[in-house]
């Protein structure tokens, strides 16, 4: 069985919003364990507002949570995104709670690797994701975007 992985998906620093992403078979159970107001029946792609809590039930931050059901996700696995305030402390505490609930810290590029291994991206598209992330001007961004969308220009 595949691991459930997690990482902070937004750059660290001060910001209005930060995202912790979880991908794998235990994503939904992790959502239910750290999202205090989580309903019994979670509707895929529905946005839920509530609070992230640690394993003692202490509130970490306000957040929205979104569950996306496999195979219709970037990675091809179940995915949950927790969107909270963009505080380094808040995001790290949410990630710590996610890991304590059964995920492991994702390796760099592992979400894209899983998308490739699950047939959601081909090799050219996986390389384009890296190029998009690293682009520093409009032209490389445009080329990588075209490559990701199937055009080799």
Q: What role is predicted for each listed range?
A:
Residues 1-142, 146-150:
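A glycine-rich (often HGG/GG-containing) alpha/beta subdomain
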């Amino acid at each position: 069985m595949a691991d459930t992985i997690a990482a902070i998906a937004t750059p660290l620093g001060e910001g209005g919003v930060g995202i912790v992403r979880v991908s794998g078979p235990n994503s939904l159970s992790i959502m239910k364990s750290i999202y205090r107001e989580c309903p019994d029946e979670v509707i895929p792609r529905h946005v839920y507002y509530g609070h992230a809590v640690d394993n003692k039930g202490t509130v970490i931050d306000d957040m929205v949570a979104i569950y996306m059901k496999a195979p219709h996700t970037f990675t091809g696995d179940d995915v949950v995104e927790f969107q909270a305030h963009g505080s380094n402390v808040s995001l790290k505490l949410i990630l710590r709670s996610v890991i304590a609930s059964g995920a492991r810290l994702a390796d760099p590029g592992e979400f894209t690797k899983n998308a490739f291994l699950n047939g959601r991206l081909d090799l050219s598209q996986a390389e384009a994701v890296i190029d998009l992330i690293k682009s520093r001007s409009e032209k490389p961004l445009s080329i990588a975007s075209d490559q990701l969308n199937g055009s080799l220009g």
